[in-house]
Amino acid sequence: MFQDNPLLAQLKQQLHSQTPRAEGVVKATEKGFGFLEVDAQKSYFIPPPQMKKVMHGDRIVAVIHTEKERESAEPEELIEPFLTRFVGKVQGKNDRLSIVPDHPLLKDAIPCRAARGVQHEFKEGDWAVAEMRRHPLKGDRSFYADLTQYITFADDHFVPWWVTLARHNLEKEAPNGVATEMLDEGLERQDLTALNFVTIDSASTEDMDDALYAEELADGRLQLTVAIADPTAWIAEGSKLDNTAKIRAFTNYLPGFNIPMLPRELSDDLCSLRANEVRPALACRMIIAADGTIDDDIAFFAATIESKAKLAYDNVSDWLENNGTWQPDNEGIAQQIRLLHRICLSRSEWRHHHALVFKDRPDYRFVLGEKGEVLDIVAEPRRIANRIVEESMIAANLCAARVLRDKLGFGIYNVHTGFDPANADALAALLKTHGLHVDAEEVLTLEGFCKLRRELDAQPSGFLDSRIRRFQSFAEISTEPGPHFGLGLEAYATWTSPIRKYGDMINHRLLKAVIKGEAIARPQEDITQQMAERRRLNRMAERDVGDWLYARFLNDKAGTNTRFAAEIIDVSRGGMRVRLVDNGAIAFIPAPFLHAVRDELVCSQENGTVQIKGETVYKVTDVIDVTIAEVRMETRSIIARPAA
């Protein structure tokens, strides 16, 4: 009788439209209940039975119920699931398999089965890639997933690498393919094989893509020739190898090994500027005045070179600092090192006054055993030989940026616009509270940005610098020339690493067109998006493998009194994040470890400070002593506490 009653349908519709609803993201807790976070200010409680319908990170619409003045959310509609493709550990065997996602807030096993076409017989502890197939908010009874790829077995020593690469859907191996002969590019190559070119790299480097040669001119100015490996002499645009390189976009450098962008025959041999081997190169010749200024007369040309020495950073640095026993093979090589050192000092001085110089941070190198175990983590400070190469590369990239801009009007540029204009007033207000007065308009110009950076570098600590970092925009890859505020340069286009960066290969092809006086098409915008996305994924992969290895390395220090110096890098409501100075590991110090009485403790992300009873006790950039309280291997997180 009521089945088709229009009044009843109307009433139902009315009730539905009057019921309050909210859209937000589900945040799970370890206690079974959760919250629907609508925005930074508002969240609703989700009771444990309702949490069974959703997963941490799901974006949903929920009905809001109010009982006894307490609001709670009942999930109703799925907008975007948190999990689609994921990696995890398999549980159970035979017909009753489930998978636990490898995520700190996802603890529940999801029933699953091997997808059609997957041959592997899954066992307890196997690592796998899975894809979600069912979700309770889509009308399914429960969650369900398909296992789409076997990664590796539980006890594989190299789990951190294989799982991380699978998680980010990145290649595990070097590409196949071989280039049999050089292309006929119609380029005149200058024979520079008689000159004393040298390469300076880490001792273990095989893919040498830059060689340097310096000479002093009669008027006292220095002439620098930068010769760069020439993979585009072997790889035709649009070829299979080229398309593979385009997809990979970069060589992926992970702790312990790299996955090259090009086949190893090219990256480590045919293109690599090995000592005493004749190699094709793309070269740039520039003249540098005593004050470090680069003359406008910049020459790009194709060449043939033969590196006369494979030098290592530490050996060259020791020799220049009069330490150690290493000596250059002959006076010709010694003279090169001395001239390159002079160029480095004058260019560094020029950049200090006219551009910006990054503060030196050490690189951290994992020393690994044959089974992937971490034997040691070594902090490698950036020494004078590193700076020689860095100054030469920055000079060469600045030259390419100018030539491509003036001759073509496009290229692959690294662009950084400093501060987001929307943040300029807030930035000026923050600086004012610390006694620095800047004009909100001026700070958006390259000159104003450089001026501010120099003032910040002159501060006694990096605290204020860390406070304004959140106002900065990110560096981007663009086909349009534009300034790089971070380097303090009017334009910056890299071409010095074509073995490991696809964007540099593109710039090689553009520079060759300039050399030949030919027209060439502007690179497509989608290639810059691919490069930016790959750079992001590679960085995440490097961080993920690093987290795993740090957890392994520090596991036996948990609960001991071993002290580590640690720099505070971030403060949040829940505590502080610190970086261990000696090895670079990131650890978290929960608020209760800072002070037992919660009401007397204020952790302010906004101010970057921790106050106890109104007194600032800790602030970002402080270095404190900590001990390792706990290492959670399943989430690769390190929990520290201030040393007593």
From Swiss-Prot:
The keyword RNA-binding applies. Keywords: Cytoplasm, Exonuclease, Hydrolase, Nuclease, RNA-binding. SUPFAM superfamilies: Nucleic acid-binding proteins. Its EC number is 3.1.13.1. GO terms for biological process: mRNA catabolic process. Residues 561-643 form the S1 motif domain. It is found in: Cytoplasm. It holds the Pfam family OB_RNB. GO terms for molecular function: exoribonuclease II activity; RNA binding. It catalyses: Exonucleolytic cleavage in the 3'- to 5'-direction to yield nucleoside 5'-phosphates. SMART domains: CSP, RNB. GO terms for cellular component: cytosol. It is an enzyme of class 3 (hydrolase). Involved in mRNA degradation. Hydrolyzes single-stranded polyribonucleotides processively in the 3' to 5' direction. Belongs to the RNR ribonuclease family. RNase II subfamily. This is Exoribonuclease 2. The gene is rnb.
